[in-house]
């Protein structure tokens, strides 16, 4: 007996390592922070580093910053909504708010000194990037200790981070410390902050926070001192530790509630939210209840969650993922699932979001739809925390979605198809900061990125696609994968050549459009001609349904694949010779005559995102 075993070698690309030991004090009267960082930085590269860089994100929250000007410029572009309203192309949370901040509302981050071996280093500020000119270079394979003294003013909540948000949360503390810029095989990733994406160095965090003793604190990492002692100034001292992460977030508020539960061995889920009333209590209790229910499914589909805890925290301005935690404006489960899934596709895999936003947001959007559908279909109506009216709405939603194609992923496909027809589409490979419009960026990263996973299910088969996502996670967790890395795992999983698919889908805006071209009598069969109208070649499935109630699926693999997929469903699959990608038409023969045919349809599953389906189906009258 021969056993076929598919092995995935672990990649050996070098990456940097960092350990942070941060001690910071928050003055809740002045909204200021003073702190120190002790950093151990390991240069695992083959390069000698003569400079290093730090992110100073909060400096974006000042009038005429890059973020401010960029937002106001985007607001000059307008779109017409589905309701016919004129909509500005800026992020509605940012708009022109930064321009109108008062000095006491600014975000300010300042590094006073950085010393290495007792020697002060030269500091050059570039708004949200701090350049550090080293007195001695950091040699390959060496470790250096840096001591950083910093101070900051917490901005009023505008985007992601800040104080006193719309829901009344006192402090949502993300991007709050001088964070070292990632250096990788492409060099330093010194992207000025304009409210888009993040990328960080894998490391270990030991964070001590000091503040007013009336405040509750939670966030990334595991609390080391649950009793939180007082320091000499009467402030509570909180100490958190987290390992193999690339960011650290926390909240502080003096009117929060805290729920927690060990949902499986080695994993405790936490929920922190603003105290208000019994209705709010039920809504946040439902978050914990639902999270426990979907966790086994998430780990089955995406891989094991490796950290000892995860926290759902009310804060911020919508939903934003961080290491071992998320900030959420409210308890809506769609956002809850989305941000939690980011733990896999961003905080465990750690792709460069600026270059590959679709590998984060797109894969997460796909996962959100999958997990939400699973939850609503299997558990939602069992929740003790939602009303009977809400349960009826969920049942109606599940029934409505059952008639939408492609199944489960209808929203992503719809968003992508609207983008493809809008005239504003740019390639997914565009740097996240440099899309011409927010509309193009968001639909490329979220909708087109999510559609890509659905499309892979069409090309390689859904069982292979599901295996791909697990193989990708297990091969590349904690290793900063890029687009080529993902496609190589897809090729190894499927046995197909898929570089062509990546080039067309990621690096171009070419669209898929196929149509039924001609039908002719051919003795006891029919000759059906299919035409490729768009510039994007694909393998094609055509289902022929006969008047006797039988059906057959005619499958034409694309020559670029150098292979094909196995039969997926119950319909008999007839495999035809490969379709040469440059040929605009393809003709195949049915097994029954033309007068026996009831209908012919290209891709009835609608997993192939065809921009014009009006020519994909024909009903033949009696």
Language-model features, listed with the residues they occupy:
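N-terminal, polar/Ser/Thr-rich
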Residues: 7-34, 63, 499-500, 504
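Ligand-binding face of N-terminal immunoglobulin V-set domains in extracellular IgSF glycoproteins
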Residues: 32-60, 65, 80, 88-92, ...
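Extended, low-hydrophobicity, Ser/Thr/Pro/Gly-biased non-transmembrane segments
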Residues: 78, 82-117, 122-127, 149-251, ...
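Hydrophobic helix-coil surface modules that form long, contiguous segments used
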Residues: 180-188, 194-337, 366-369, 378, ...
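Beta-strand-rich binding/interaction modules
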Residues: 218-219, 512, 519-581, 593-603
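Zinc-dependent metallopeptidase catalytic helix centered on the HExxH motif
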Residues: 326-406, 469
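Amphipathic alpha-helical substructures
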Residues: 433, 439-528
